[in-house]
Amino acid sequence: MTSPEGAQNKEIDCLSPEAQRLAEARLAAKRAARAEAREIRMKELERQQKEVEERPDKDFAEKGSRNMPSLSAATLASLGGTSSRRGSGDTSISMDTEASIREIKDSLAEVEEKYKKAMVSNAQLDNEKTNFMYQVDTLKDMLLELEEQLAESQRQYEEKNKEFEREKHAHSILQFQFAEVKEALRQREEMLEKHGIILNSEIATNGETSDTVNDVGYQAPTKITKEELNALKSAGEGTLGKAKEVEVKKEIVEKVGQRETLQNSEQEQPKPNTGKDCVDRGVSHPGEKAENQRPAEDSALSPGPLAGAKCEQQVQSQDQENTSDLKNSEQIESHKVTNKSDSRASNSPEQSSCLEGLDSEVPGPTEDLKTDLGKGSFEPCPDYILGQTAEIDKVTCTDSRGTGGNQREDEVQAGDTTVEDQVGTVASGPAKQSKGTENHGESCLKDGLGQSSERELTQEVAEPEEAIVQIPQAGGENTITKADDAEGRDEKPIQAEAQASPGAPINQSGHQDTTGPGSTDAQRTPPHAKERKKQGKSEQQAEALDSPQKKTKNKKKKNKKKKAATPAETCRDANEELNCQDPDVGDMEEEERLQVTDKKQASGSPEQKIRAGSREPVEDPQSGSSGKQNKVEEDGPTEGPTDILDQNSPQCEDREISPVGEKGPQCDTSQIGSEEGHVTSQHGGQAVENHNLDNSDLSGQLEGFNSESGGQAREEVGNSKSKEDCTMS
């Protein structure tokens, strides 16, 4: 009995609280039913037992009552006949009935005992039956719960089985990928072993490649050398870059000091005929290369210290490339110091020209000048450029007034000195810029020779020349007046004779027209040519101040300029239509038509244009707006008359370089356009505004010129120029 209760307790423990309450309710109901059944059975047994006890008494009474009548009847029958003889037989019948009654009572008592025992055993069996039925119910409940657990286990088994299948599939994929990666790694190792490359972070230092790239069998690791270890130890806590920068600064400071002492010592030495020697060396050897001329100039200008300094600077040039910004700043300061000393020490044209050649031949200043001219950056180098060219122009002016007859010789000498300066620049510069610097030399030679050929011309037509300089042609040709055409033919032999001597720059002059916008030739304008622009502007300011009486005439001539502006606009519209049809051929013709209109305006109001030119910088708006196309070829002949006018004018001694003009050579395309718009808004001249508009429109059209049409453009310019000379003569 105890085992089912223990099982029931376990079952109750396993069930939830609600199931436990239901099970307890069922058990309580069953107990109550069993208790009632026991009470009913006990009452029934007691009643049955009472009946059994009462029945023998009733049976005995009933038997006695039945026997008495029978006996009486028997006795009466026996007694009615022979009563005496039948008396013994009646006594024996009574004895038999009593014995049978006793036997019946004994058997009845035995049956009652058996019945009682059967009732007790029946009750016990009933109790056992109820207990077994309760156990069956509990076992049924446990079976249901186990069935539920089995179903849950089966569901979990299915989920685990599916998850296992997924993991198995992923494992197979990863195993396949692992095999592929392993194969790729094996191939990589084979390739590395084939080429002899060893992958190790401790082998290569500072990006050095291993020496075993081309050697298959040799795989020894490259180690840090003793010099690198010493360099790392000497650096200390600071980085290698800072230590190297400090060393480079020290070297630059020492080099600048040596350069200053060298140039000061050379300036103090008297050189009586150095200018003529420079001309002879720069002109008399046309077959020599720029590299052959450079050692001769170095030996003539500096006997010992210059050569030593030059070699030292060439040795240290590799260290200077790593710190180009520091080098440029230090060299700019050195140029300022040396050029101030040059301007104080220069007393003759020969000494100033030779010092200019010396500065161009020293490697340091040459590289600085190369970066200033090539990049067109806004660095403080205009002080250095002005310091040299101002001296040359002032000395040439005084010499032209003093010598008189030797005027042409001095101009040739100045031009040849400039050529020698540019040849020195060619020799010291890199090979990729040799073509551009030789073109500069050729343009400088044209500048010097143009001064000697047009000096007498500009004395007669000084004022019209001032106005025409402001309107240069975009094709590299200069505007020439009637006086220029008349006297230019007589001076052709002089120009040809002067141009025959320097051969190397002139041979390469044919390449200048073919350069497109933004080329190296257009970016490198000689510094003395830029200075002559500034001096021409200051000359025009001086003439405008000295002639206040002409201002009243300018008011009367404004109406003429307004009338002259309309032909320029109509000509510009016609030129735009012609450019749409024939852009290669029509550009030069419309430029010539525009120049005829500009010359009429210049001849009609020269004083007003000189007054406007005194405020407006003499620059080429076409070349500025079109990327300075062919600016080297334009500056040579165009700026020559301006310089000659400065030398022949009475205000030559009193002229000063205006601070506004110093910014002119460094201006780029946007600054030139903004400066022109500002100038036209100040003095409000209709003619100058129309010229700027026409030239800016033509500059946009000239951008379509390429290097292939350069030869055709030059031929058309020559033909149109000859036709123009005939018509104007």
UniProtKB/Swiss-Prot annotation:
Keyword Ubl conjugation: yes
Any Pfam family matching the protein: LRRFIP
Keywords: Acetylation, Coiled coil, Cytoplasm, DNA-binding, Isopeptide bond, Nucleus, Phosphoprotein, Repressor, Transcription, Transcription regulation, Ubl conjugation
Residues forming coiled coils: 94-194
Region (Disordered): 40-98, 253-729
Record-level GO BP terms: regulation of DNA-templated transcription
Residue stretches of biased makeup (Basic residues): 550-564
Covalent cross-link (Glycyl lysine isopeptide (Lys-Gly) (interchain with G-Cter in SUMO1)), residues: K249
Positions with biased composition (Polar residues): 260-272, 313-326, 344-354, 506-523, 667-684, 693-710
Modified residues (N-acetylthreonine): T2
Protein location: Nucleus; Cytoplasm
InterPro entries: LRRFIP1/2
Tissue and organ distribution: Ubiquitously expressed.
Principal subcellular localisation of the protein: nucleus
Entry keyword annotation includes NAD: no
Biased amino acid composition, Basic and acidic residues: 40-65, 277-297, 327-343, 435-445, 482-494, 608-618, 713-729
Region (DNA-binding): 465-567
GO cellular component, one term: nucleus
Low complexity bias spans: 78-94
Residues that bear Phosphoserine: S16, S83, S84, S88, S92, S302, S346, S348, S538, S547, S614, S670
An example Gene Ontology molecular-function term: DNA binding
Family to which this protein belongs: Belongs to the LRRFIP family.
Role noted for this protein: Transcriptional repressor which preferentially binds to the GC-rich consensus sequence (5'-AGCCCCCGGCG-3') and may regulate expression of TNF, EGFR and PDGFA. May control smooth muscle cells proliferation following artery injury through PDGFA repression. May also bind double-stranded RNA. Positively regulates Toll-like receptor (TLR) signaling in response to agonist probably by competing with the negative FLII regulator for MYD88-binding.
Domain notes: The DNA-binding domain is intrinsically unstructured. The coiled coil mediates dimerization.
Subunit structure: Homodimer. May also form higher oligomers. Interacts with FLII. Interacts with MYD88. Competes with FLII for MyD88-binding, even in the absence of LPS.
Protein name: Leucine-rich repeat flightless-interacting protein 1
Native organism: Mus musculus
High-level lineage: Eukaryota, Metazoa, Chordata, Craniata, Vertebrata
